[in-house]
Amino acid sequence: MSLLTEVETYVLSIVPSGPLKAEIAQRLEDVFAGKNTDLEALMEWLKTRPILSPLTKGILGFVFTLTCPSERGLQRRRFVQNALNGNGDPNNMDKAVKLYRKLKREITFHGAKEVALSYSAGALASCMGLIYNRMGTVTTEVAFGLVCATCEQIADSQHRSHRQMVTTTNPLIRHENRMVLASTTAKAMEQMAGSSEQAAEAMEVASQARQMVQAMRTIGTHPSSSAGLKDDLLENLQAYQKRMGVQMQRFK
């Protein structure tokens, strides 16, 4: 796996799924391929994105700044600085300085990532802030190692909370989760369908599913009534894809 592929993988792992994630993935690919070099426009776009947490925006801003060639005097952005200040905790700042000294001695991506993984996400973000504010310099490879370690720490905690939700025995939460997943699957089907004639059937299935979810929410139903709803939808989607000759593993 190339270095930039690895960076893209880690960064996208902390972005919530949805149309915005696809948009960010495209921006990252363009930046890494050297197709998008307008850092100012990129940062303006990032700043106004909804849904993303300030820390995720800060990390993305840091990655864009590392990758885009920019004029020496280009202003640092306040929204990135605020996100990478370790919540203003002096403890985080002390640890960030210690980590920075260790990173100065590293020259490889994996070496830097290994060193950084023993620190908390707050200290890692503060260390990124030091580098972003030009208070310290490390090689781009080492900075990317720091980015990936931070994303891994965040993704780990997100995974724990996601697993808690998936394994919850509370029938109401499970029911709502199935309906939300059915809705998002239906939305994805509608987006994929496009304007081809064969798409009418997929649109119909998706539309029915969304109406069913709406009705269930409006009248209130037994928590087990949504079981199988998403699976039925996915079966329909995969059957439609086969006829269209499309194979999208991502939905499985």
Swiss-Prot record:
- Xref: SMART domains: Flu_M1_C
RNP-binding: region residues: 165-252
Q: Sorted alphabetically, which InterPro entries does this protein's record hold?
A: Flu_matrix_M1, Flu_matrix_M1_C, Flu_matrix_M1_N, Flu_matrix_M1_N_sub1, Flu_matrix_M1_N_sub2, INFV_M1
Output the GO biological process annotations, alphabetical, semicolon-separated.
Answer: viral budding from plasma membrane
List UniProt keywords, sorted A-Z.
Answer: Host nucleus, Membrane, RNA-binding, Viral matrix protein, Virion
One Pfam family linked to the record:
Flu_M1_C
Where is this chain's protein located in or outside the cell? Virion membrane; Host nucleus
Location of the region described as Membrane-binding in the Swiss-Prot/TrEMBL record? 1-164
GO molecular-function terms, A-Z: RNA binding; structural constituent of virion
Its quaternary structure?
Homodimer and homomultimer. Interacts with NEP. Binds ribonucleocapsid by both interacting with genomic RNA and NP protein. May interact with HA and NA. Cannot bind NP without genomic RNA.
Instruction: Add the further remark from the entry.
Output: Most abundant protein in virion. When expressed alone can form virus-like particles in transfected cells.
Q: What is this protein called?
A: Matrix protein 1
Give the gene that encodes this protein. Answer: M
